[in-house]
Amino acid sequence: YISIIDVVLKLLIVYLLSLTSYDRLIFYAFLLLIVQVLIRITYGIYCKRHFIETAYRFVWDKMLFKEMANFATWQLFGNLAAVSYTQGVNILLNMFFGPAVNAARAIAVQVQSAIQQFTANFQQALNPQITKNYAINDLKRMHTLIFASARYSFFLLFFLSLPVLLETEIILSLWLKEVPEHTVNFIRIILVISMIDVMSNPLITAAGATGRIKVYQITVGGVLLLILPFSYGMLKMGGIPEFVFLVHLFFVCVAQVVRLGLIRSMISLSLRKFFKEVVVRAFMVTCLSSIIPLLSFLLLEQTLSTFFLICVLSVLSVSITVFFVGLLPNERQLVLLKINQWIKLKKS
């Protein structure tokens, strides 16, 4: 319900913007701040009423303050690194190509955010369990949850992304009257980046659970900051805007490898098992489920009816491939059990 209230309030903000004669950007920022404060207060009230362990009291624990400050400092470093390369890319694109290309990137990021929201909600349910199992020293269960979260998140994101990757042009033509140049390529590359990046989220949660994030944040943040100088170098040598996204893709892959190496030593994670259960299955699902939709996209004339056909084929192809290739044997049995229970319930 709180999420619904959040969305309704933001919709109300859009309506109020059409009524005001004041500077709309400042007014929008002010209203957005009020909404965030109200939502935060609402969450606080809810937790206080429903969880007995949620209570405020004044304490003085010097060691606890030191630990929290240390954790917050290095967490802030990682967040600043992410903001720096994200906004830095915007500045570079504006410097070399002007606002039109920045507009294309903004559209691509908007598509990315809409699709990623589905996986973010799913991962939000598993993250506390990952942290809890580290706290009780059940590393085996923690590893299982990390593998499952990375795998399922990839499948869910790919399920939503495949039709968008294939039918980017027609989706944009239905959405926008004028599509900025480079938007199609930007969306396709940024969705590939998202599919690699989504597998890192449970690893980030695992690193945070240990509390020992100094080396992790410096190393991974440092790798991601390299996006800026390399992108600048590419553009300075006459590269096209897409090169910035390809540089981003490369360093996201490097960061993932570095991240796995660091997590391995932090929680004794098996890289072989991660590669076998997550990477290999994700790769096989991607390759096998793309065949029929891709052939249809290449062979059929691009019309609105073809668009709907490819969407249906993508959904069916990914669903079937995930079931037979992506899931582990015990997971397939669980799915079949749930389906049988649902059928029996409907019959009764």
Model-flagged regions — what are they?
Residues 51-53, 108, 112-150, 157, ...:
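Helix-loop junctions and terminal segments of transmembrane helices
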Residues 2-49, 71, 221-226, 240-262, ...:
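Hydrophobic alpha-helical transmembrane segments
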